Every structure is written in C-alpha cells, then in structure tokens.
C-alpha cells in the first residue's frame, strides 16, 4: 500500500493481521498459538498452549494493555515504544479491523481493502481515504471507530446496567464506562 508509513502504518499493519486472521480461520481453524507443542500432554494444563492461533493477537494486545503500555494507533511510528511498534500495535489494528468487520457485516471490510489497494496503486493514500471509503459503504456511523479505537487509547470498559430477570432468561444493558 502506498501510504505514509510514519503516520498511517496502522492501516497496512491492520490489513496484514486482519488478512492473516481470515486465512487462519478459513484454512487452519484447528491451529493453536503454540503450534505442535500443544500436543504434549505435559503442557495441556497451561492456558497459553490451548489458545487458538488467532487468540494470540488478543493475548499480546492485552499483555500491552495490562502493563499500561497501550498507545493510540494513530501515534506516529517514531513515538511508539518498541513492543508496540513491532508487535502490539499491529495486532491491535488487525483486531480492530476484525471487530469492525463483525459490526459492519456484508463483507464491507474485504471489499474496502481491495478498493483501497487499487486506489493506492494510482496515488499515495492516507487515513482519510480509508475512512472515506469505509463510510461510503455503510449507513452505520463509524465515528466511534476512528475517534475511540484509532485516535485514542481509551480502554473499553463495559459495565452491566439494568438487569431484568424473566422466567427463562435475563435481559440486561451494557454500557462503556
């Protein structure tokens, strides 16, 4: 992708990880994060060995968050700490695209990626091109994605609101603190 790798690196990194996640889901759904070492019975009790391959992205991202090393995805690359530059920001971007894909449905992310690549072959593209392209494909509001997920390091912290107990089910509201 022909874009400014100092400021918009997260787009190409996110596309790369997102595509890897989709590939693994489709062609290797049984693969584990630790690979064939997961087959050894002596290691079965360790949670890390039992994680699916794509769960490693969440694992490493959460490792960064728990150590309070999270940085916004739109932070210039030269301002990132080494762990974020090499690992966690890429995973966060890929997970964010995967989350957005689930939210938008209708194959919007894969289609937008193809169009973004085509656009980048003609000119240098930027975040605004990517944002405009995504917003043109849906009627859903995407400001939350760019303002909260990309531009800030605000953590998503859900809290249960009102809980209604019925005969055979529970109804509840969730809100982000």
Per-segment meaning from a language model:
Residues 1-176:
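Hydrophobic alpha-helical and helix-loop surface patches within well-folded domains
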């Amino acid at each position: 992708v022909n874009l400014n790798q100092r400021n918009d690196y997260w787009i190409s990194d996110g596309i790369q990880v997102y595509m890897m996640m989709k590939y693994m889901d489709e062609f290797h759904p049984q693969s584990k994060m630790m690979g064939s070492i997961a087959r050894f019975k002596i290691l079965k009790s360790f949670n890390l060995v039992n994680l699916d391959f794509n769960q490693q992205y969440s694992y490493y991202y959460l490792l960064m968050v728990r150590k309070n090393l999270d940085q916004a995805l739109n932070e210039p690359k030269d301002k990132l700490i080494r762990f974020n530059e090499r690992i966690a920001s890429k995973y966060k971007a890929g997970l964010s695209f995967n989350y957005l894909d689930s939210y938008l449905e209708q194959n919007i992310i894969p289609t937008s990626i193809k169009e973004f690549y085509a656009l980048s072959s003609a000119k240098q593209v930027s975040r605004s091109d990517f944002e405009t392209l995504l917003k043109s494909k849906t009627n859903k509001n995407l400001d939350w994605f760019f303002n909260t997920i990309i531009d800030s390091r605000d953590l998503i912290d859900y809290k249960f609101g009102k809980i209604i107990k019925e005969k055979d089910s529970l109804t509840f509201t969730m809100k982000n603190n």
